[in-house]
Regions:
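RNA-binding basic/glycine-rich loop and surface signature characteristic of RAMP-family CRISPR effectors
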Residues: 1-269
Length: 269
């Protein structure tokens, strides 16, 4: 973000490439095992007056050394762009046209408990002319949402995703929602994060969508429409625990299980 506007991936690439060509040490690091590629860039830099001029040359359609650009792009993704290492992106800049498939893929969430939609009118601001209008705002009394995702090992090697990146991701996905001040995130809190790490040679997603092993039912004799808080639900994770226990071990599919829980929720294997 710059100010109140989003920075496109192409503009971000442009800024980082320009900073890199201005820094000889960084450029040499990028091409540490590619001396011929480094030579191409240094020859261009020696002839041009500034980084903007270098950028125009290496992104020109007539530039004959596009493979050198891809070497630089691979370095920048692995060293500078943690978001692309996680979720991938497509670059559409001349000389840098390439798509990276993100190792981390998340599905849409759905509610474990039945909900009743409550529609209400809300004021929607039209940003371009400063005016406002009324729109529909759909809410529910309470919903326990579940999300499923995968981390693909081959794609992770392609983008350079590291174990440190994964640690950042786990903390971010756990802490970001309650930290968000937006109206749509109000009163949303994580209860359980569970990640299955497979043994070497076992492809991810072996057990399908793990949400299929979770059941949530109203307790205390109340109906679905009367659910108002987390404590109103009975969460049955027995099938999930059974799945993990039967498949965990050095000679089985599961290597380890990473778990985070809220203070008001207990889950252990």
């Amino acid at each position: 973000m710059e100010g109140n506007s989003k920075v496109s991936v192409d503009n971000k690439l442009r800024a980082v490439v320009k900073r890199t060509v201005e820094n000889v040490g960084e450029l040499e690091k990028a091409f540490s095992d590619k001396p011929d590629a480094l030579k191409v860039y240094k020859e261009i830099i020696s002839k041009e007056k500034d980084a903007e001029s270098v950028w125009k040359i290496i992104t020109d359609k007539k530039f004959k050394h596009k493979e050198v650009n891809y070497e630089l792009l691979a370095y920048l993704v692995k060293e500078k762009f943690i978001d692309i290492r996680m979720f991938g992106s497509a670059f559409a800049v001349g000389g840098f046209t390439k798509a990276y498939t993100g190792p981390i893929q998340l599905n849409w969430g759905y509610s474990f408990n039945k909900v009743e939609l409550i529609d209400s009118s809300t004021i929607v601001t039209i940003m371009n002319d400063g005016s406002s209008t009324f729109g529909k705002d759909y809410r529910v009394h309470y919903s326990l949402l579940g999300f499923n995702g995968t981390i693909n090992a081959p794609a992770a090697r392609s983008t350079g995703l590291t174990n440190k990146d994964l640690s950042v991701f786990r903390n971010a996905i756990w802490e970001s929602i309650p930290a968000s001040p937006t109206r749509s995130k109000l009163n949303q809190y994580p209860k359980l994060y569970l990640e299955i790490v497979y043994n070497e040679g076992v492809s991810n997603g072996q057990f399908g969508d793990l949400r299929n092993f979770v059941e949530a039912t109203p307790k205390g004799g109340i109906t679905d429409k009367q659910v108002r808080r987390f404590k109103d639900l009975d969460i049955d994770l027995d099938l999930l625990k059974k799945l993990i226990k039967e498949n965990k071990g050095s000679d089985k599919k599961i290597k380890e299980v990473i778990i985070k829980t809220s203070v008001d929720f207990n889950f252990s294997l």
